[in-house]
């Protein structure tokens, strides 16, 4: 407790008296020492933000040199190394953190927190989708852009649009990936449905083409299957009791060692971010044409991210916790800068875990349980730009969306964002699912791909912000439930009535008045019964 003459632990300058000297907090030396301490504590945040700004300046300076594609590849090499290191650490981090987190929580607490997390993810994603559809109808990003061609955007290597997939096959793939047939293969490959067109000639001379779905394996970690397996394994180890303690300690130790590796990698993040941002700016052919051609679509998407990330999510956090959400977000500047540069929720996961535990004091059991799940299934930012893109393409093709199609966009965007990969441009692949669901063509997807490198940055920031605020809400609710349980336990202890008879019989200070007699063995018998 502070004394009356103290403020934040320091003596007031008016009453400091002879204790004030060159090193006192009120002097220039004290202020310099506090400033140096602040810079030392926030060094990683300042370096990361500086890396983003330096990368933008580097890219702007090198654009006039007309670098070849080979030279741009060399320029991006330090950033590529950062992405490889972050992806290398994802597998042990996700599996170990979920196993240790699930094993450290009892079944009732795990079920309660899991239910709250699912409700939070569903609520925020659905609200993000509704906000995006409303903004798209207000701003009308597709009006006046009907004559726009992808070749006009100066992006030669945008590639072909993804093959459209049936909506039912997309959800079946989601279920298949939840239960991988081989855990080792799930670490680097994902199940995906492809199609084979079979031509059949009937006896009447009619030719029919049938599209048959076939199962394939594509490159990419099946994070959904690994998350589910790790959760179930943690619960099973908790169920084993003492027999599973050794394996739980193993996963805890491996998790702590992984976090040490993360802390080392984080010091390379500013360098990698600088070259990632710089190489991407150099790579673009004509940014001015790109922004002016699709400016309304970019504006609608980023405005949706700003409203959802700056108003909706903080408001939800405040309603549940009654705390300042922006003070909570201030401790997460480094993960936000990493998300902005890497465009990957999965690559931001190590940084987010480290900062949310050290800077914001979130319980490790909560953060290591909810953040890996959130990085996989909670995609608020992706839902926003997917809905805006769907309405944008509908307006490009002069299609008036009815109420049924709008409802389909909301539901499909909310559901498909669960299976969206937490990698750069992963959300673009799910736009084809939405377009197929409402009956729109997919030949305009290259326009979305052309500006995805811009929109995907704010998309990833909103994705990881939603995960972080969700962890903060769960931490607050868990603390509240713990305090309530301790208070109820204290009330039970106060109201308990001591057993005076038992205390009298078992106290070594009590001398019985009639120790001898025919009933001398009775106290011994009663004592034995009380032990049993």
Curated annotation (Swiss-Prot):
Job description of the protein: Sodium-dependent neutral amino-acid transporter that mediates transport of alanine, serine, cysteine, proline, hydroxyproline and threonine.
Polar residues bias spans: 1-10
Extracellular side: 140-216
Protein name, UniProt field: Neutral amino acid transporter A
Family, as annotated: Belongs to the dicarboxylate/amino acid:cation symporter (DAACS) (TC 2.A.23) family. SLC1A4 subfamily.
Gene Ontology CC: cell surface; centrosome; dendrite; extracellular exosome; intermediate filament; melanosome; membrane; neuronal cell body
Residues bearing the modification Phosphoserine: 507, 527, 530
One Gene Ontology term of the molecular function aspect: L-hydroxyproline transmembrane transporter activity
Location of the region described as Disordered in the Swiss-Prot/TrEMBL record: 1-25, 500-532
InterPro entries: DAACS (IPR050746), Na-dicarboxylate_symporter (IPR001991), Na-dicarboxylate_symporter_CS (IPR018107), Na:dicarbo_symporter_sf (IPR036458)
Membrane topology: Multi-pass membrane protein
Keyword Glycoprotein: yes
Alphabetical list of Pfam families matching this protein: SDF
Subcellular location as annotated: Membrane; Melanosome
PROSITE patterns reported for this sequence: NA_DICARBOXYL_SYMP_1, NA_DICARBOXYL_SYMP_2
Single biological process term from Gene Ontology: L-glutamate transmembrane transport
Organism: Homo sapiens (Human)
Tissue expression as described in the entry: Expressed mostly in brain, muscle, and pancreas but detected in all tissues examined.
Positions in the Cytoplasmic compartment: 1-41
Modified residues (N-acetylmethionine): 1
Residues of this chain annotated as glycosylated in UniProt: 201, 206
Compositionally skewed regions (Low complexity) per UniProt: 14-25
Impact noted for substituting residue 457 to W: In SPATCCM; does not affect localization at the cell surface; loss of uptake of L-serine and L-alanine
């Amino acid at each position: 407790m502070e004394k009356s003459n103290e403020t934040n632990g320091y003596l007031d300058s008016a009453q400091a008296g002879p204790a004030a000297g060159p090193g006192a907090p009120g002097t220039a030396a004290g202020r310099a020492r506090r400033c140096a301490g602040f810079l030392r504590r926030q060094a990683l945040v300042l370096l990361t933000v500086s890396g983003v700004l330096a990368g933008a300046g580097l890219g702007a300076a090198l654009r006039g040199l007309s670098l070849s594609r080979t030279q741009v590849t060399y320029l991006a090499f330090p950033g590529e190394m950062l992405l490889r290191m972050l992806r290398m650490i994802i597998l042990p981090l996700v599996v170990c953190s979920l196993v240790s987190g699930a094993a450290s929580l009892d079944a009732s607490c795990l079920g309660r927190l899991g239910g709250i997390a699912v409700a939070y993810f569903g609520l925020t994603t659905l609200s993000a989708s509704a906000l995006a559809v409303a903004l798209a109808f207000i701003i009308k990003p597709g009006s006046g852009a009907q004559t726009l061609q992808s070749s006009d955007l100066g992006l030669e290597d945008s590639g072909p649009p993804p093959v459209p997939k049936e909506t039912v096959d997309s959800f079946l793939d989601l279920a298949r990936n939840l239960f991988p047939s081989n855990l080792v293969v799930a670490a680097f490959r994902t199940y995906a449905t492809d199609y084979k067109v079979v031509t059949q000639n009937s006896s009447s001379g009619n030719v029919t083409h049938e599209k048959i779905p076939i199962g394939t394996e594509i490159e990419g970690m099946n994070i959904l299957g690994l998350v589910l397996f790790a959760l179930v394994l943690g619960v099973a180890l908790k169920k084993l009791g003492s027999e599973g303690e050794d394996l739980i300690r193993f996963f805890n130790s491996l998790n702590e060692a992984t976090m040490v590796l993360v802390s080392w990698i984080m010091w390379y993040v500013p360098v990698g971010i600088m070259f990632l941002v710089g190489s991407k700016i150099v790579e673009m052919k004509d940014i001015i044409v790109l922004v002016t051609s699709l400016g309304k679509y970019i504006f609608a998407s980023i405005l949706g991210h700003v409203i959802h990330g700056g108003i909706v999510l903080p408001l939800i956090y405040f309603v549940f916790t009654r705390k300042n959400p922006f003070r909570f977000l201030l401790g997460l500047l480094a993960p936000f800068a990493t998300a902005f540069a890497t465009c990957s929720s999965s690559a931001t996961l190590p940084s987010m875990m480290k900062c949310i535990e050290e800077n914001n004091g979130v319980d490790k059991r909560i953060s290591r349980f909810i953040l890996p799940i959130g990085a996989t299934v909670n995609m608020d930012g992706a839902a926003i730009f997917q809905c805006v893109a769907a309405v944008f393409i509908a307006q490009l093709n002069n299609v008036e969306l009815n109420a049924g199609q709008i409802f389909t966009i909301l539901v499909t965007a909310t559901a498909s964002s669960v299976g969206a990969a937490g990698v750069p441009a992963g959300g673009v692949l799910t736009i084809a699912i939405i377009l197929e669901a409402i009956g729109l063509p997919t030949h305009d997807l290259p326009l979305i791909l052309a500006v995805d490198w811009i929109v995907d940055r704010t998309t990833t920031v909103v994705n990881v912000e939603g995960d972080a605020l969700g962890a903060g809400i769960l931490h607050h609710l868990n603390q509240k439930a713990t305090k309530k349980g301790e208070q109820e336990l204290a009330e039970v202890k106060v109201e308990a009535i001591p057993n005076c008879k038992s205390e009298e019989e078992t106290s070594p200070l009590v001398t019985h008045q009639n120790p001898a007699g025919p009933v001398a063995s009775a106290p011994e018998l009663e004592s034995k019964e009380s032990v049993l």
